[in-house]
Swiss-Prot record:
Its EC number is 6.1.1.14. The lineage of its organism: Bacteria, Bacillati, Cyanobacteriota, Cyanophyceae, Synechococcales. It catalyses: tRNA(Gly) + glycine + ATP = glycyl-tRNA(Gly) + AMP + diphosphate. One of its GO terms (biological process) is glycyl-tRNA aminoacylation. Disulfide bonds: none annotated. This is Glycine--tRNA ligase alpha subunit. Tetramer of two alpha and two beta subunits. The keyword Protein biosynthesis applies. It comes from Prochlorococcus marinus (strain MIT 9313). It is found in: Cytoplasm. One of its GO terms (cellular component) is cytosol. Belongs to the class-II aminoacyl-tRNA synthetase family.
């Protein structure tokens, strides 16, 4: 199955489960969790079901395209459903079947691995899902986001698309993956990967990055004070990515790292509180929405 077909198949599968299908969020982030469609929607009592592919950036993971299974830019497929439905593990296994994995014939294990994002003030209990010894998915019941308790508890399912593709295509190098029947993953992303690694490790200006971090932090703080959680989150994400760039340059000491993570986490808490206040003032409108039955088409 081609890389783009994995995304199409997961879109179709999760749409059939009632998920809203969305597109990637338009700023740098280290994980699909950081999209407002997950990190904000996980907060508060309103029901939510969403699925989307998300490009992710982790500057320190770059290897100039020389590593067969590691890159600073990669893709996740993100699912968030709140409240967590009964039988979600079986539904997830059905999604693997939709991708062509006969679950009865393969070794699929749920290996306990609780998840945490210190910068987001988020954590959950869950598992890594291993397919024949390779981790392909993270399965997490969120307990907190932005330092706020999640009630009801959502389920987050995060597929590593490259790893799934390597398994499905029986390929050992991500750059050799077929994107479609004409182009490889490397055709599309390898040149960009090399250039971005140069920036991450050599060409970026650490002093300028530190200035940017301070500016983004100030902007986020001002927006939180104005009770504007959506744009404030954008600048929190910019803080997070800039911090990751500084780490890639090797200019963050252990003490600075702890302090900087604390600064970002404090901002994330402010965004979460502002979001919850905003939704409460609106009367939590999604609590009153009635879903259309799946067997009834929209009426024009």
């Amino acid at each position: 199955m081609h890389f783009q077909d994995i995304i199409t198949t997961l879109n179709s599968f999760w749409a059939d489960q009632g998920c809203v299908l969305l597109q990637p969020y338009d700023t740098e982030k280290g994980a699909g969790t950081m999209s407002p469609h997950t990190v904000l929607r996980a907060i508060g009592p309103e029901p939510w079901a969403v699925a989307y592919p998300e490009p992710c950036r982790r500057p320190t993971d770059g290897r100039y395209g020389d590593n067969p299974n590691r890159a600073q830019h990669y893709f996740q497929y993100q699912v968030l459903i709140k409240p967590s439905p009964v039988g979600i593990q079986e539904t997830y296994l059905a999604s693997l079947e939709a991708l062509g994995v006969c679950t009865a014939e393969h070794d699929i294990r749920f290996v306990e691995d609780n998840w945490e994002s210190p910068t987001l003030g988020a954590w959950g209990v869950g598992w890594e899902v291993w397919l024949d010894g390779m981790e392909v998915t993270q399965f997490t019941y969120f307990q907190q986001c932005g330092g706020l308790d999640c009630s009801p508890v959502p389920i987050e399912i995060t597929y590593g698309i490259e790893r799934l593709a390597m398994y499905l295509q029986n390929v050992e190098n991500i750059w050799d993956l077929s994107w479609n029947n004409k182009r490889s993953y490397g055709d599309i992303w390898l040149s960009l990967e090399k250039g971005q690694c140069d920036f991450n490790f050599e060409s970026s200006d650490p002093s300028r990055l530190k200035q940017l971090f301070d500016l983004y932090e100030a902007e986020a703080s001002d927006l939180i004070a104005k009770q504007l959680p959506a744009p404030a989150l954008d600048f929190v994400l910019k803080c997070s990515h800039t911090f990751n760039l500084l780490e890639a340059r090797g200019v963050i000491s252990v003490t600075e790292r702890t302090a900087t993570i604390g600064r970002i986490r404090s901002l994330a808490r402010g965004v979460a509180e502002a979001w919850l206040t905003e939704r409460e003032a609106m009367g939590f409108p999604l609590l009153n929405n009635k879903a259309l039955p799946l067997d009834q088409p929209l009426q024009s």
